[in-house]
């Protein structure tokens, strides 16, 4: 069974429907005590980093997610959910994250971008240049759907995917049993569905 974490910040319905499409027994979970009963966790998210961390803390879900990650079972963060995996974010101030992957979340550096060609937020289809990973089984450099104004900065050893938007940025990460994915697989048609299928087999 797969738990989709509900902390009042997620694109829950679309992630749930994508799981249902591939025949996965997924449940939207808001009770942190239940998380340990699942085999995999999806941490979705849409919105501001600081608000998301506040919700995770206030609901008790932060500790539940950290405990789940420590158990060694697979967990994936999607979009804002991926950013929460890192140590900190500079979005609207300085905020601490879950600290599951070393690194931080920063705004797109507009000084490196042609702003006539590259608007922020980064919205739409773009190519993810992937390294070999179980998450990308059968896929090579897939086009996926993005919506974000911030991106992660981390050590190269954790990066399994990069995307170019004015400059190269980190769009997929992996550390042990923990995966992060900046684009939205649930909005990325066949390529995104394949990535969700691959996660279910990890």
Where are these regions (language model features)?
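N-terminal beta1-alpha1 ligand-phosphate binding loop
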Residues: 2-24, 185-187
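Structural motif
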Residues: 42-44
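Cysteine-nucleophile active-site neighborhood
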Residues: 47-122
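Short acidic low-complexity segments
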Residues: 1, 26-37
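Short gly/ser/thr-rich secondary-structure transition/capping motifs
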Residues: 21-28, 56-59, 125-131, 162-164
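Pocket-forming structural segment of enzyme catalytic cores
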Residues: 89-167
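C-terminal and late-domain segments of enzyme folds
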Residues: 151-202
């Amino acid at each position: 069974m797969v738990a989709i974490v509900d902390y009042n910040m997620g694109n829950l319905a679309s992630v749930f429907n994508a799981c249902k499409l591939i025949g996965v027994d997924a449940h939207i979970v808001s009770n942190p005590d239940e998380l340990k009963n699942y085999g995999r966790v999806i941490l979705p998210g849409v919105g501001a980093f600081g608000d998301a961390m506040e919700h995770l803390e206030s609901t008790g879900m932060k500790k539940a997610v950290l405990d789940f990650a420590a158990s060694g079972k697979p967990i994936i963060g999607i979009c804002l959910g991926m950013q929460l995996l890192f140590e900190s974010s500079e979005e609207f101030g300085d905020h601490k994250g879950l600290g599951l992957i070393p690194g931080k979340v920063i705004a797109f550096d507009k000084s490196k971008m042609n702003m006539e060609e590259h608007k922020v937020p980064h919205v739409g289809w773009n190519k993810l240049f992937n390294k070999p990973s179980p998450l990308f089984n059968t896929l090579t450099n897939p086009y996926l759907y993005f919506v974000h104004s911030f991106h992660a900065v981390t050590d190269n050893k954790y990066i399994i995917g990069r995307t170019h938007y004015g400059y190269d940025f980190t769009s997929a990460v992996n550390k042990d049993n923990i995966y992060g994915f900046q684009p939205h697989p649930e909005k990325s048609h066949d390529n995104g569905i394949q990535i969700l299928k691959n996660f279910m087999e990890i």
